[in-house]
Swiss-Prot record:
InterPro entries: ATPase_NBD, Chaperone_DnaK, Heat_shock_70_CS, HSP70_C_sf, HSP70_peptide-bd_sf, Hsp_70_fam
Induction: By stress conditions e.g. heat shock.
NCBIfam families membership: PRK00290.1, PRK05183.1, prok_dnaK
Name listed for the protein in its UniProt record: Chaperone protein DnaK
GO MF terms held by the record: ATP binding; ATP-dependent protein folding chaperone; unfolded protein binding
Listed Acidic residues bias regions: 622-635
One Pfam match: HSP70
SUPFAM superfamilies per record: Actin-like ATPase domain (SSF53067), Heat shock protein 70kD (HSP70), C-terminal subdomain (SSF100934), Heat shock protein 70kD (HSP70), peptide-binding domain (SSF100920)
Family in the record: Belongs to the heat shock protein 70 family.
Source species of the chain: Ruthia magnifica subsp. Calyptogena magnifica
Keyword Phosphoprotein: yes
Keyword list, A-Z: ATP-binding, Chaperone, Nucleotide-binding, Phosphoprotein, Stress response
Record's compositionally biased regions (Basic and acidic residues): 612-621
High-level lineage: Bacteria, Pseudomonadati, Pseudomonadota, Gammaproteobacteria, Candidatus Pseudothioglobaceae
Role played: Acts as a chaperone.
Length: 635
């Protein structure tokens, strides 16, 4: 049976882990790093797709084809305010497609967020496979606790496109609690997980109990903001740098994508440095140029200035904390321990603010960048049977219901209900002789239907003619362990039933997902062929170099005819390298190897002769010249 891996699909960075001999193992990627930038790039002059650090390295010179923070678009519609805000902040193109979803366009091709996220998941899959030495087909993938149904479904689609059977979607704060609590917590504790990542913020209140040797993790409540994270902090620094540069130099950098990409990298670096230093310098030579010549950016930023720039963002995290406590029917003093998760929590001001709110110093026992992946691996271990005595009870973050007469949302399942769960309610017709009812499924907390998230709708038809209010239609909601919803409607009189797994009114169809899976498989073939081509080119380069070197060393021992034949074979191989025909390169490698065989034999003969000479010399050195003394016989 193949191993189930745990993947933290982050906005800024991603991470993969497995259970290994009863312990969690974070797996290093091919670059030797424990986390991978969630960045995908499409180079201008190549069909290759770059993922992770290689994509990040070329971002400055290729900003419009370098995609980052794609998680913020997953499961979202183009017209949402959050998406409209991002359009003006990122260098790549966000577009609206026919179903209303927000996609991106790169090099003339439109792509869905799950399709792009699948590239990052694919990198995590390959990282695990390289470590394990076997194919991986199953995974547990984490999502922000406050992700709605559309975003959860889109994340599952991304896993599927990457070639994985997603065994479970698990909330990030819950995963972090697992990582923290499985080994470190004894007895019963109520903990708060404050998770401020690259693009999202979550807070969860979780009760941990030891019951007859089994650890129970029960989520009491969760809240958050799916468009608040480190990326927003970076943007505040970028905005400050742009304003200061414009004031000082009179040049607006917002219209220069390459300059903005350099500013983004500098902002992220400055933010990290200010977590351990009181001040940092942002130096960007030749950031732009005008008629007067090149312009250099040199601006000092203090920690106090950064705190001022992001003060409102920090305050935005407190309200969800208050709501989560209220929903759990607890006060801050009831919390035993606070865990910080997400790279942005390394900011000292965040730690202080959380400490002030909960009245206790946050624990630093877990790595904020790795805790979520570790928890995903533990959950994978539970599902695979490797981890015993752990029970996880998660919740649905938002209320679920249907639209009823007058545009009102009637809730069937309240937020923070433990999942899996189901609920049913009887509804009726609104007018006489109504032959069909439309079930419009909603998610959210508002009473007005229009103010909530529309998850989809379907019709139950064939209802017999009857006065309004007489037919009985039973609507049933069923949420699985991933927080994904099935809805059915049944006419109690006729027994007719209609049911669907909720897909957002947008979202990817099954056909689109299958097409993307096939595209991903095709790209996997392309990637393999590309790697094989590069290997052949490298072999050719190495052979050319060594042959030229040998020719030079043996120039006095090689005839002009031999030299001419070998040099011609070298020239032909050099020409072949300039094209991307692997077969032609391999053929020319064989030709040069064959033509250069006499050279190889000469080198071997020369080496053998030298060794023989050395051995003879050593043997001569080993002969001892003895001193003889003549002894005269006196007899």
């Amino acid at each position: 049976m193949s191993r189930i891996i745990g993947i933290d699909l982050g906005t800024t960075n991603s991470c993969v882990a497995i259970m290994d001999g009863g312990n969690v193992k974070i797996i290093e990627n091919s670059e030797g790093d424990r986390t991978t930038p969630s960045i995908i790039a499409y180079p201008k002059d190549s069909e290759e797709v770059l993922v992770g650090q290689p994509a990040k390295r070329q971002a400055v010179t290729n900003p419009e084809n370098t995609l980052y923070a794609i998680k913020r678009l997953i499961g979202r519609r183009f017209d949402e305010d959050a998406v409209q805000k991002d359009i003006n902040l990122v260098p790549y193109k966000i577009v609206k497609v026919d179903n209303g979803d927000a996609w991106v366009e790169v090099k003339g091709k439109k792509m869905a967020a799950p399709e792009i996220s699948a590239k990052v998941i694919g990198k995590m899959k390959k990282t695990a496979e390289d470590y394990l030495g076997e194919e991986v087909t199953e995974a547990v993938i984490t999502v922000p606790a406050y992700f709605n149904d559309s975003q959860r479904q889109a994340t599952k689609d991304a896993g599927k496109i990457a070639g994985l059977n997603v065994k479970r979607i698990i909330n990030e704060p819950t995963a972090a609690a697992l990582a923290y609590g499985v080994d470190k917590v004894k007895g019963n504790k109520t903990i708060a997980v404050y998770d401020l990542g690259g693009g999202t913020f979550d807070v969860s209140i979780i009760e941990m109990e030891d019951i007859d040797g089994e650890k129970h993790f029960e989520v009491l409540s969760t809240n958050g903001d799916t468009f608040l994270g480190g990326e927003d902090f970076d943007q505040r620094i970028i905005g400050y740098l742009v304003d200061e540069f414009k004031r000082d130099q009179g040049v607006d950098l917002t219209n220069d994508p390459m300059a903005l990409q350099r500013l983004k990298e500098a902002a992220e670096k400055a933010k990290i440095e200010l977590s351990s230093s009181e001040q940092t310098d942002v130096n960007l030579p030749y950031v732009t140029a005008d008629a007067s010549g090149p312009k250099h950016l040199n601006i000092k930023i203090t920690r106090a200035k950064l705190e001022l720039l992001v003060e409102d963002l920090l305050k935005r995290t407190i309200e969800p904390c208050k709501t989560a406590l209220k929903d759990a029917d607890l006060s801050a003093s009831d919390i035993d321990e606070v865990i910080l998760v997400g790279g942005q929590t390394r900011m000292p001001k965040v730690t202080k603010m959380v400490q002030d709110f909960f009245g206790k110093e946050p624990k630093k026992d877990v790595n904020p960048d790795e805790a979520v992946a570790m928890g995903a691996a533990i959950q994978a271990g539970v599902l695979g049977g490797d981890v015993k005595d752990v029970l996880l009870l998660d919740v649905t973050p938002l209320s679920l219901g249907i639209e009823t007469m007058g545009g009102i949302m009637t809730k069937l399942i309240e937020k923070n209900t433990t999942i899996p769960t189901n609920a049913s309610q009887i509804f009726s017709t609104a007018v006489d002789n109504q032959s069909a009812v439309t079930v419009h499924v909603l998610q959210g907390e508002r009473n007005m239907s229009s103010a909530n998230k529309s998850l989809g709708q379907f019709n139950l038809e064939g209802i017999p003619n009857a006065p309004k209010g007489q037919p009985q239609v039973e609507v049933t909601f069923d949420i699985d362990s991933d927080g994904i919803l099935d809805v059915s409607a049944k006419d109690k009189n006729t027994g007719k039933e209609q049911s669907i797994t909720i897909k957002a009114s947008s979202g990817l169809s099954d056909e689109e997902v299958e097409k993307m899976i096939k595209d991903a498989e095709a790209h996997a073939d392309e990637d393999k062929k590309f790697q094989e081509l590069v290997a052949s080119k490298n072999m050719a380069d190495s052979l050319i170099h060594s042959t030229k070197k040998t020719l030079e060393e043996l120039k006095n021992e090689v005839s002009d005819d031999e030299k001419s034949v070998i040099e011609m074979a070298i020239t032909e191989l050099e020409k072949a390298i300039k094209n991307d025909d692997k077969k032609a390169i391999d053929a020319k490698i064989q030709t040069l190897s064959k033509k250069a065989q006499p050279l190889t034999e000469k080198v071997q003969a020369k080496s053998s002769a030298e060794n023989t000479s050395k051995e003879k010399s050593k043997a001569d050195d080993d002969v001892v010249d003895a001193d003889f003394e003549e002894v005269k016989d006196d007899k």
